[in-house]
Amino acid sequence: MGKGKKGGKRMSKKQLSERLQDFFASQPGKTLSFKEIFRALKLDTHPLKMLAIDIMEEMTWDDFLTRVTESSYKLNTKGQVQEGTFIRKSNGKNSFLPDDGGTPIFVSERNSMWATNGDRVKVSFMARRKKHIKEAQVIEILQRSKDQFVGRLRVDRNMAYLITPENTFVHDIIIPKRKLKGGKDNDKAIVKIMQWPDAEHKNLIGEVVDVLGQTGDNDVEMNTILAQYGLPYVYPKAVEEAAERISGEITKQDEAEREDFREVFTCTIDPRDAKDFDDALSIKQLDNGQWQVGVHIADVSHYVTEGSIIDKEAVKRATSVYLVDRTIPMLPERLCNYICSLRPDEDKLAYSVIFNLDDEANVKDYRIVHTIIRSNRRYAYEEVQEILEANGVIDGTGEPAPKAPKGGYKGENADKLVTLDRLAKLLRAKRFKAGAVKFDREELHFDIDEHGKPIRCYFKRSRDANKLIEEFMLLANRTVAESIGKIKKGRKAKTLPYRIHDNPDPQKMETLRQFIVKFGYKVKTDGTKGAMARSLNKLMDDCDGRPESKMIQSVALRAMMKAKYSVHNIGHFGLAFDYYTHFTSPIRRYPDTMVHRLLTRYANGGRSANEKHYEELCEHCSEMELVAQNAERDSIKYKMVEFMAEKLGETYDAHISGITSYGIYAEIDENHCEGMIPMRDLGDDYYDFDERNFCLIGRRHHHKYQLGDAIRIQVAKANLEKKQLDFTVAE
């Protein structure tokens, strides 16, 4: 016993082996002598020293270590060094993504060098020990993805620190009391790192740069989500002041230079709570029987000069952000909600695509022009839907209203709205016939009280009134892209930001095929674009209304490439368009403003714009779009958890919406809130995940949980900080 105590507690061979691995991994490339190793690991007894020497010898057989001399070793990195991106996971399963697009490689916490998610790093590959997965270790952090972090302050008498959500770091960020900037215990705050850990300093040291307010306050929590993604939660005063100086007056020169549509029936159709009206539609019948449909878009580029302080802020933001209870606009409120917004009964400047359509919705002619419009009516989608249904339209069938009765269609401007709907449905049918992919996704919505609390939770799906607007916006975007990009063979098109969507990823399509075959479905994983699209549409139709439908749609969406902006056109797979851009939402998307400016430039005989400059802007806008989407999803998750937090202990009918190796996802039938039943809480048996058949099977009683099964759940936990709901199976 005496010998065991001298060097501290006894150590097994496995424990000592792990300590030796960690020690060598922490000092890649360094030759370490027995003396240094024994001292660092406090191996004071002869048996422990001999055991360490034996283990190191075995490690040379595994190619984990290289013997340098009789009494020194070093880590065998095999000289493999690569650069790439570090991906941090809250469960400790961090990974390294090589720049060359290779397979992600595991990086243990001890080998991460305090890298944070998204950091550019250099790694060396550790020699793989027998029965061990391939591992990398960070040897240099090339570029930090960020140096500011958002979290909750804990302040006591002796110290203060920041707790980050999702456990960004193994240890919390220590904050000197003098650097709190007035922050109090339980406040949400933004902290900047002053000192990263290194060989001499083991702690993260930070300072508060902004205090957001007390945890739990609705405004504070929404601003926290924005801050976590580096999105602005306040508008710079100088930019707002610049917007105040802009006049909304329409001059005689404006009238002289623009087509006047103020006498043509025009309306906007938007969500009930919308304030920024980007687009309007006008319609009239021409003497030749054709329909003149105008797609009128707010002329933002007339008011926002390229390179101005407002423009620079818009570039930085690149998009408006739509959280559950608020909009964070790309442009100052005076512009997006007033001057540019196509409000009813006000003269407005627009950039318009005017179509002449025959009765079959074939485009017989078009022109792209600057206009002055005056919206006669501001409709909510629900109002238009009511008018359509009052005149015989059955939502979702794709069928237009029957022929007008003797007294005409019922409702305000019903004849015009019914005609627009009929033309839109013809356009939609042509698009799907050409190979467009059909994904009708439902979105979770909340009714919010005056304090920002969710009081109702429900799904909203796109209806015929939504699709009416969508089809004319798609037509305008496509036409604008063709007007610049579609040129004679052998000539080079002028620079334009396109909205591109590549063909599905073949490997992910194969994953989809393997997944759906378990449910008896098929899908084409190769072939022409049209064949793949038709196959995907058949799959969506076949599984519609089935228990597995939601999960199949989710896996199918993951097989799709992400749409993005680029000056290098490859077409749009999902829409089946060879040319497509974004022209119709310049109030909330910067690429649309770019397109407006370039159209004007080229219409005035200007030369092609700098391709490299516009590609850089496209890449930035694509990145910011993803950031905004993630923030929007987080706000939905937060409100869902907040909604259920007051219902702890309550039981609900639900159905199984997802199954993984670590538990069951269940969606409540009544309100569509989704939570997880961890595997450890399925206490009636020990369950195995059957990956082939996508179910859990009990070892003793052989009870099975599978997709779509009805299940009675009890709300167990609601973690607002992590935005997670936990359920248990109700007794």
Model-found features: residue ranges?
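A short macromolecule-binding patch
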Residues: 103-108, 169-175, 672-689
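Charge-lined substrate channels and their catalytic hotspots, especially those that engage the 3′ end
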Residues: 2-294, 301-347, 378, 385-386, ...
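Electropositive polyanion-binding surfaces
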Residues: 39, 190, 195-197, 214, ...
